């Protein structure tokens, strides 16, 4: 079964006549002519071909048996295993022996699969190293080479070297990589920047978009579209000229806007929603509506407690993963219950700000190349998006940006995602000033800014602080002239990370910052990860700007 743009489509996403158990949703549109097979990965010279099938597709009931039996503590382990022989032979063997009285599932898996390698197990940090030295010495530990790919594994081969976040994440991730690149540039690792630039361009060429990560099970979704920001970084640091990426930026834009022209007001298709006034805004989406391979058991359990059709819940869980904020009160109908997730009904402020940046980048590079018609078209698109955001996502009463629930036609919760319009230059100065006041009073702590002001047990909420949010807030407020707030966030975050490093001698994915005593951040569906790519990247860049704490 090939990946498709829509597999097992959610009944709520259909507007065609089929037999359904649930009432059709008048808001959603599905177009038969837009369903086409995912492109197969191309061969990379000297490397085995990547397999476009996900482990759940390929191993069928064996996959479900392994995940249901919890033979590994982390649901991501089995999808990341690589087969020792042809996967079809493994499935045939499993079907022959699974009903034997002495069948041992764990031994079967160990005999037929290579378990994921933990690359950093032998690395021990030197407690005498400064924070800067520690980060610079971690880049080789977090670097993966193309030859690491094993035939038939879920890992998608890439033509060049790349950085992984660390811990359970042994592949490259889309939006993580941008913040990691900030540190690579500061460390003088132009070699790795060039490799990663080529890898992301290659993925757009071969898949039509940048997947969530380079795994087959990530092909059905992307992540926050930050390639335009990467291109800007490549240009600023002299790594690659921006002009060479214009076609790639246009291809990514086409992916995010697919189906837009066929929509009428109050309809949605994939990532696009046409608002009541005819304007276009975007949402997060995943083309599949099945449990995620990497969190299969967790998704099945969540759906059981939802009281909704399971495929609806799976789609929203997947879309939440596409947002990068997996998970947060931003996506929940009931902030204390993950089963109430409704990601696809929210118009996110950060996503639309990133797409504003993408539209602006296409316009700017088109101008450099003398393509005046394209420049004018995309300036108009960026302007229209900013106007729509101001109509639907700006809360003038409270002076903040908020996500918008397009189904209920009401504003949603306030979070640190509200700072992204400043980072991409979409806000006006009055909006920036008012948002600064809200951040000071509602999100700022002695350790940095909180992801949100709500305690839900989810990792992208209070009490946690995340490196990418700090960076965008620092630069965003400084861009609008609020150096005082930007510098305060920067120094607070550096103090948080350095204090934890001095005590634990490591960098981690997220930090508990709510009470001024930095410690490990909690929440989420997996244990805290160390490494950690984007924390290293942001902190290394801040050290270059502010010095070591």
Swiss-Prot record:
PROSITE patterns: TREHALASE_1, TREHALASE_2. It is found in: Cytoplasm. Substrate binds at residues 168, 175-176, 212, 221-223, 292-294, 324, 525. It comes from the Bacteria. One of its GO terms (cellular component) is cytoplasm. Its main location: cytoplasm. GO terms for biological process: cellular hyperosmotic response; trehalose catabolic process. Signal peptide: none annotated. The keyword Cytoplasm applies. GO terms for molecular function: alpha,alpha-trehalase activity. Its EC number is 3.2.1.28. It is an enzyme of class 3 (hydrolase). Gene3D superfamilies: 1.50.10.10. It catalyses: alpha,alpha-trehalose + H2O = alpha-D-glucose + beta-D-glucose. The keyword Nucleotide-binding does not apply. Keywords: Cytoplasm, Glycosidase, Hydrolase. The active site is at residues 326, 509. Pathway: Glycan degradation; trehalose degradation; D-glucose from alpha,alpha-trehalose: step 1/1. Monomer. Hydrolyzes trehalose to glucose. Could be involved, in cells returning to low osmolarity conditions, in the utilization of the accumulated cytoplasmic trehalose, which was synthesized in response to high osmolarity. Belongs to the glycosyl hydrolase 37 family. This is Cytoplasmic trehalase. It comes from Escherichia coli (strain 55989 / EAEC).
């Amino acid at each position: 079964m090939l990946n498709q743009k829509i597999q097992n489509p959610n009944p709520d996403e259909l507007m065609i006549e089929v037999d359904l158990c649930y009432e059709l949703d008048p808001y959603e549109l599905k177009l038969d002519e837009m369903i086409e097979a995912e492109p197969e990965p191309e061969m990379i010279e000297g490397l085995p071909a990547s397999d476009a099938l996900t482990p759940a597709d390929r191993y069928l009931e064996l996959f479900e048996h392994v995940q249901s039996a919890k033979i590994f503590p982390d649901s991501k382990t089995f999808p990341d295993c690589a087969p020792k022989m042809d996967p079809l032979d493994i499935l045939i063997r499993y079907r022959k022996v699974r009903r034997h009285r002495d069948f041992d599932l764990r031994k079967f898996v160990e005999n037929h699969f290579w378990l994921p390698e933990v690359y950093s197990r032998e690395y021990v940090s030197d407690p005498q190293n400064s924070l800067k030295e520690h980060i610079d010495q971690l880049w080789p530990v977090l670097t993966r080479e193309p030859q690491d790919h094993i035939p038939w594994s879920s890992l998608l081969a890439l033509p060049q070297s790349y950085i992984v976040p660390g811990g359970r994440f042994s592949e490259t991730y889309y939006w993580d990589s941008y913040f990691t690149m900030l540190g690579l540039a500061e460390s003088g690792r132009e070699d790795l920047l060039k490799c990663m630039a080529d890898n992301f361009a290659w993925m757009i060429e071969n898949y039509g978009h940048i997947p969530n990560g380079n795994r087959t099970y990530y092909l059905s979704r992307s992540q926050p579209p930050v390639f335009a920001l990467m291109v800007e970084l490549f240009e600023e640091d002299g790594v690659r000229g921006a002009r060479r990426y214009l076609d790639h930026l246009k291809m990514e834009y086409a992916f995010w806007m697919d189906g837009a022209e066929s929509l009428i007001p109050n309809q949605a298709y994939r990532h696009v929603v046409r608002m009541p006034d005819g304007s276009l805004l975007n949402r997060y989406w995943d083309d599949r509506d099945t449990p995620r391979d990497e969190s299969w058991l967790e998704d099945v359990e969540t759906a059981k407690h939802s009281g909704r059709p399971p495929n609806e819940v799976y789609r929203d869980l997947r879309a939440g993963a596409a947002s990068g904020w997996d998970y947060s009160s931003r996506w929940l109908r009931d902030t204390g219950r993950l089963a109430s997730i409704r990601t696809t009904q929210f118009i996110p402020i950060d996503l639309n700000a990133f797409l504003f940046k993408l539209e602006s980048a296409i316009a700017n590079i088109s101008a450099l190349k003398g393509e005046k018609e394209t420049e004018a078209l995309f300036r108009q698109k960026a302007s229209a998006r900013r106007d729509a955001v101001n109509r639907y996502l700006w809360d003038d009463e409270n002076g903040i940006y908020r996500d918008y629930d397009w189904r209920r036609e009401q504003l949603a919760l306030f979070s640190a995602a509200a700072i992204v319009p400043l980072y991409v230059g979409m806000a006006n100065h009055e909006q920036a000033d008012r948002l600064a006041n809200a951040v000071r009073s509602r999100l700022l702590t002695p350790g940095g800014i909180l992801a949100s002001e709500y305690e839900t047990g989810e990792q992208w909420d209070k009490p946690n602080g995340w490196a990418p949010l700090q960076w965008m807030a620092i630069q965003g407020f400084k861009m609008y002239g609020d150096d005082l707030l930007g510098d305060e966030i920067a120094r607070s975050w550096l103090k948080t990370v350095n204090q934890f490093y001095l005590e634990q001698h490591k960098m981690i994915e997220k930090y508990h910052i709510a009470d001024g005593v930095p410690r490990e951040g909690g929440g989420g569906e997996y244990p805290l990860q160390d490494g950690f790519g984007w924390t290293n990247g942001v902190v290394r860049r801040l050290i270059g700007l502010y010095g070591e704490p």
